[in-house]
Design a protein with these regions (language model features):
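An N-terminus-focused feature that recognizes amino-terminal "leader" regions
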Residues: 39-120, 215-218, 282
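Transmembrane alpha-helical segments of multi-pass membrane proteins
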Residues: 59, 121-130, 185-198, 255-264
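Juxtamembrane "helix-exit" motif on the non-cytosolic side of transmembrane helices
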Residues: 72-78, 136-143, 207-214, 270-276
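Hydrophobic, ordered structural segments
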Residues: 100-175, 264, 268-271, 278-307
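Core segments of alpha-helical transmembrane spans in multipass integral membrane proteins
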Residues: 89-106, 126, 224-244, 260
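Membrane-interfacial, low-structure loops and terminal tails that flank and connect transmembrane helices
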Residues: 32-47, 171-187, 312-315
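Surface-exposed interaction/gating patches
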Residues: 49-68, 174-246
Length: 315
């Protein structure tokens, strides 16, 4: 049985008739292969998947509501929130984290590139997981008959798993960085990591031994509120994200979130200045940290915008 190659090399009838002639030449028909376009691999197109956007859209209303209660009327948490929070500085600190969360998840809805928001998901998982753990550790401190308590409990039991799931799934679409993309310098990366180490270390102390931390904390805290503040500080693990992805485009969103949080914390410290014990070093350290985030973040955002402009437009 003739193979396909035999058919491609078979001579024409005219050639076959003259195959005995020495002058006859066999002409072979070329085997032309058409090029087939290979579709782009969808798993590396850097898009934000629908489940990720849906989760972001579902979380935003809860964060907005929590922010309005805790920041606008922090003295009414006993009647409006999952548990009465005192003093108001703690309520406003948690509200500042919610404000940063709103900014982050709105960015998730708006962006078309997964890598620009990817590093923000692990901190959310840690934050929500720690608040869920604090809820069960201090179950008796909550107002069980209030709808806000059940919303709080459901949110912080479910959210860590949902956020972790969408992050793991959406990571499959991550595209590699282009060679010419602007990146952070070595010293800037070290500053990010150092800030993360300080924030997370203090957060871990508050989560593990809140009673001990209360002796040095700038305002009055309980075991529950100490662990809540610790969860907020553990959002600092976002600083470690530069070890995985140090592109400006991957970092700028996290810087914006940090600046939003720092702005509201600074205002809260002014509003609750009578609650803060300014003779404690951590009070001034917190003020310095907030200032560093606002100033350093502003400088970095300016550099990022400059790097995005064409060379001829830079000054």
């Amino acid at each position: 049985m003739a193979s396909p190659s035999d058919h491609r090399l078979r001579s024409t009838p005219h050639e076959s008739a003259n195959c005995g002639s020495g002058s006859a030449r066999r002409v072979y028909r070329p085997n032309v292969t058409r090029s087939v376009a290979v579709p782009r691999e969808k798993s590396a197109d850097d898009r934000v998947l629908r489940p990720t956007r849906l989760l972001a859209a579902g979380i935003i209303p809860f964060l907005v509501t929590g922010f309005l209660i805790l920041y606008i009327v922090p003295g009414r948490t006993g009647e409006l929130f999952a548990w009465p929070i005192a003093p108001t500085m703690t309520a406003m600190l948690l509200a500042s984290a919610y404000a940063g969360g709103v900014w982050f998840f709105v960015s998730v809805l708006r962006t078309r590139q997964w890598h620009t928001v990817a590093e923000g998901f692990p901190p959310v998982v840690v934050f929500a997981g720690l608040l869920g753990g604090a809820t069960f550790l201090h179950w008796d401190r909550f107002t069980h008959g209030h709808v806000a308590f059940w919303v709080w409990t459901t949110l912080y039991v479910v959210a860590p798993f949902l956020v972790a799931w969408v992050w793991l799934v959406n990571r499959r679409t991550a595209a590699p960085a282009a060679p010419d993309e602007p990146r952070l310098g070595a010293w800037t990366r070290r500053v990010f990591v150092a800030g993360g180490v300080v924030s997370v270390s203090l957060g871990v102390v508050l989560v593990v031994v809140p009673g001990l931390a209360s002796y040095v904390w700038p305002w009055a805290i309980t075991s529950l509120t100490g662990r809540v503040i610790g969860a907020v500080l553990c959002l600092g693990i976002a600083g470690f994200g530069v070890l995985r992805d140090d592109r400006y485009s991957s970092v700028v969103g996290l810087v914006e979130v940090a600046m939003v949080m720092a702005t509201f914390v600074a205002i809260a410290m002014l509003r609750a200045r009578d609650q803060i014990e300014w003779n404690r070093p951590l009070a001034w350290a917190m003020g310095a940290g907030v200032t560093a985030i606002l100033v350093g973040g502003g400088v970095l955002l300016t550099r990022f915008r400059s790097a995005r402009r064409p060379v001829g437009e830079r000054r």
